């Protein structure tokens, strides 16, 4: 066998038939898949949640808001009425690309038709009003705000509705139930039962009152079916809500030992509805005089007024589902309220009390709610979050309109004069710019971008706070299956509060997460049943093949019904004997396969359904979490035959959160794919099933931190998800229609589409991402090539031929090496540096603004005071650096001068001023310089001035942006990781000749510590190593999907085929001595990534620099050019060694002895002996602090004479002229 070359060149080969793998075509890379389970449906578009939600807001959400706020009348309701009619979006002024370049928001003007009606005359005035520029979503699901891409993260919150909770009484051990009625907007109602059987309620978090007060009060409200209503007349109120009426309502529940309503009535001071209203008012408004009108108005506003109380569509749906659908007394069932009714009805309150009593009585079939169940938590997507903020802006605007209506004369008033758009514009700016859920997009690589758009956060307004969130809400719940990934969540304080949608999950119109399942048919409707339907409500497909039999909307007559029934029955195996009910004749026996003739005979019988052996259809239903709890669901890996029938009689299933083995006759649904449980990031980990969950979590999170490399390389061992993840990430270019490539250059692809239209795709070249990584698109199609809609036509920075490529395939050995890989450190071959295998490009942006100051305008110029020609060599005549210039720390990028404050001029200076005019005015150098530790090449310079029609902030005359590009090779101190949570820091870069090598002379690239595997329990990396070695040697790329990947037997088979040892171990030779190591070593190809934690961003050193103004100690941190903190524990270390002089230096001259440090610096420079240290400044601060508390504190010398701590530092410093240690002159303060 030829030796394995260092650069792995992979081309698809003809697969031997007996290996038993299938080709998986994705993009231009052909993979060989170990999957045994075919996906029932294709993966959905992974960012459709964001796109659909924003589209809903544009079309429906805004209309809802304008209808909700109209009409606006003046305070009297007699003069004017303003209505918002239809609206439309204009065209954006600049496209996304231009907005990014100019640093502005990608938005379109929104215009609304407004109608003003003068009520006294009936006159109508209509006009179109500009309601501000509204940020638009790009086709990738992001917003461009002030030139930066942002994402609005979906929020996972408690759904509006009623929740019942069980609490144990600590003394008696009895189960007592409480309930919370949570609206989308308005007052909460909290019901609870005490141990004396009294049911009380809190209205809007006020004092507790017996629930019968509320029941009596609402009995005086006459509700209409549409939710509107009115109070009963005064004379009737005395008769409503009496004890007898209430006892009658709940008579069927007052059984056994506990009489809840009776006990509550005993505590109730009121006797009828009128008294109850007044009592309720007293409790809710303790200081106000209780009158019947006030009480009625208050209760109506709190519970029955749609402008103040809104259950929302979801709240009403949940309320109906919880209270009315689970009705235990259908014989007296009142009609459930219509789903359009979004206010509370008296019946809802009666039902809640009824359900509480039933729960307290232990009624079978009823139980308290699980608040962490996903049936009780819903997702607020982008559209809804924006709608909520827009509502806030409109309500502020409504207040302004009402005030203006009361001031303006109706005859002269116009819609334009009344409407002030500022509150709406401010609300939207506040939301996109600063809201907790509008986040700066993580753009490190395409996966980070995709995951950010699929994130679900329980934090934010109306959600949880991380300090108060307990363990239960963070934990994995059985209802998360297929909806929220159980693996991918941050480590740290946000663990479990921030999650990611699973691969197949989607959000339904109510905001609940749904996941797809394949329908299992256990019986087939006969022809009579199909005919009874009249019209098909869904497509009908053959249960075995998935072929279309009849389309949705087809009229079903007798002939069509027979055709459908025959097609469905053919090929099925009967579960029971088929007996003709009219003659009693047995037409077919159980276990018999139905052929066409038998099917036609069965169809003629009047039987309604025919029971068949369960068959898994291609029909897919999306189920929400509470719907799923009603069904028995089998996993995707249950073995099926070629006709999609179960091979075994019993299967492992999930039912309402429990796992069980059941007969196949009880199964309702089957998972669509093994990877539907996990998110995209987790589905990219091969052999996930062999990794511990904690390490899989780290692996998922670290893939998002992988820095795009110079030459992306797709993994040899993938999972088949790489193509989909890259396609939907938004960083690659996807063809929008079928066509032929006319031209493909480095910065543009032109495609002639089949309809004759020519479409041009501009590529992004060396653009800076939000995280300073490089985005560079490269065409992967050529002239004359045919492309299909949805094909990837250009790669981005971390994709290779349309597949996600976050790292590099490297040859790894698991062995200790001179302690160089102790504690997860990584030893790396110099080849990775020399051949730029882990080299990445980073682009940083530096900007400077020339502003108007009180002393005059700043100026961008080459004419900078006290700067030599050498420092100006790379600047053009405007004072701006040339593109292509190589720069070092402290080099000038943009020359800028700022006017200095005027001082009293001497006679000579006044003379110079008179002769030369303004030229002699003092200016200071405020140029933009390269920060410490940064070096690179200038790749772009943009100059923006007011004359160029660029929107600059007030007071800014000119802005210059400079882009600086760095090429960073892998170096000691960089963090690297695999996909299994196996992370480490590069400890040393060894020469190629010192690396251990294989028997054929191939040196390994990386040496990892074998001790890092057993305790971490991420065995996936070992299996990846073995399979990677075999696949690379055979020239394949493989896909081993999660939970359905290569088995150990298959890996051994592949190793044998590649003429490699079946245990994956081989004798290695020491590169330094040439001798063989004493035992075989595991060697193979692993996909390793370089993470965004680069040593170059973290390393930092300081000799002198800025000091804190109060304590005079050096500042901390790299950003402030600070020093290293010599803390309490470090002082203990020096004390332990008795290093008194070193300790004194640390606490004085190296820190905050102001005079001492200057004198020490001077002594070092002049080569003189260092003087004794003085008093540290922080000690003086401490004395002042104590004195400020009124304590008399004195400092005494050894002979107990007071020492005067004078501020003589200034005079001492004045003597040391010219020595500046503070960095103050550089403008740090």
Curated annotation (Swiss-Prot):
This is DNA-directed RNA polymerase subunit beta. It is an enzyme of class 2 (transferase). One of its GO terms (biological process) is DNA-templated transcription. GO terms for molecular function: DNA binding; DNA-directed RNA polymerase activity; ribonucleoside binding. HAMAP family: RNApol_bact_RpoB (MF_01321). GO terms for cellular component: DNA-directed RNA polymerase complex. The keyword Transcription applies. DNA-dependent RNA polymerase catalyzes the transcription of DNA into RNA using the four ribonucleoside triphosphates as substrates. The RNAP catalytic core consists of 2 alpha, 1 beta, 1 beta' and 1 omega subunit. When a sigma factor is associated with the core the holoenzyme is formed, which can initiate transcription. The lineage of its organism: Bacteria, Bacillati, Chloroflexota, Chloroflexia, Chloroflexales. InterPro entries: DNA-dir_RNA_pol_bsu_ext_1_sf (IPR042107), DNA-dir_RNA_pol_bsu_external_1 (IPR019462), DNA-dir_RNA_pol_su2 (IPR015712), DNA-dir_RNAP_su2_dom (IPR007120), DNA-dir_RNAP_su2_hyb_sf (IPR037033), RNA_pol_bsu_bac (IPR010243), RNA_pol_bsu_CS (IPR007121), RNA_pol_bsu_protrusion (IPR007644). It comes from the Bacteria. The gene is rpoB. PANTHER family: DNA-DIRECTED RNA POLYMERASE I SUBUNIT 2 (PTHR20856). Coiled coil: none annotated. Keywords: DNA-directed RNA polymerase, Nucleotidyltransferase, Transcription, Transferase.
